[in-house]
Amino acid sequence: MNGPRTLDVVQRWFQAVVTHPDGVEGGVDSEEAQRLIRLKRNELEAVVRRSRNLTAAERLSIYANAYYTRLLECLGTYYPVLKSTLGEEVFEGFAFEYLQRYPSQSYTLDRLGESFARFLEETRPGREEGVEPDRVDWPDFLIDLANLEWNVARVFDGPGVEFQPLLTPEALRSFPAERFAEARLAPVPCLRLLSFQFPVNSYYTAARRAGEGEEVPLPGPAPERVALTRRDFVVRRYALTVAQHALLEKVLAGATVGEALAAAAGASDLDDDALAAELRAWFRLWAAEGFFQAIT
């Protein structure tokens, strides 16, 4: 396309050049850039003027380097524990490849890391010959950790209830017992449930508390279930048992309290009396921690 160079054409050409993974030279030669403005590398000054000290290519390289530097920094803020676990160089290698497959689609960058866990799943190494196909290993740990960190970020940035009334333990306790089984709990919008193959929530806590240069032992595979919510603009993480997870999963799906209790009973090996005592303690805790907005 070598017609009049409108501002729109030049802007799209500039984007194609400075965002190319092979740098400015690769960007100039790319199909998209050539479609917009056909020129050779030594003809760059027909579009971008040189300065007193820098050539056109050098000026473009400043933008190209800054573009990826900013995106890598942004991904690092979403995945700080994953970055420290892998090391900066390895993390940025993964992140750079990710940006080629899932380029930024928003000027705000607030969803830049949305598909990072999916990318790790898509690019995970094949399992070694002779290893059971359902065995979990190191890549699965990284995928779990990425999923946890992204959900923490989304809960932090997402809707919350900081200035809204919540269901208090007192209000829950005073709800008519005869209506309890058929009632429905309204969870707060920031409540999320997660299930992992590795204890990444425990690892995340240890890694965030570790001092600079302190190594945190990597855990072996062990199922872990977690609830995330936000209170007073701080993301809270709660380890869950299988029965707790089953109960809250039903609540989030809009089931009645009775249906949620049945799910918890089916997932628990406690006898009826012991489970009833546990359920009372769970509901007191969850109401105190702001899991629910109302019961109707």
What function would you assign to each model-found segment?
Residues M1-P176, F233, Y238-T296:
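Long, charge-rich, low-complexity alpha-helical segments
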Residues E178-F180:
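Short aromatic-glycine motifs in intrinsically disordered, low-complexity regions
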Residues A183-A253:
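Low-complexity, glycine/alanine/valine/leucine- and proline-rich hydrophobic stretches
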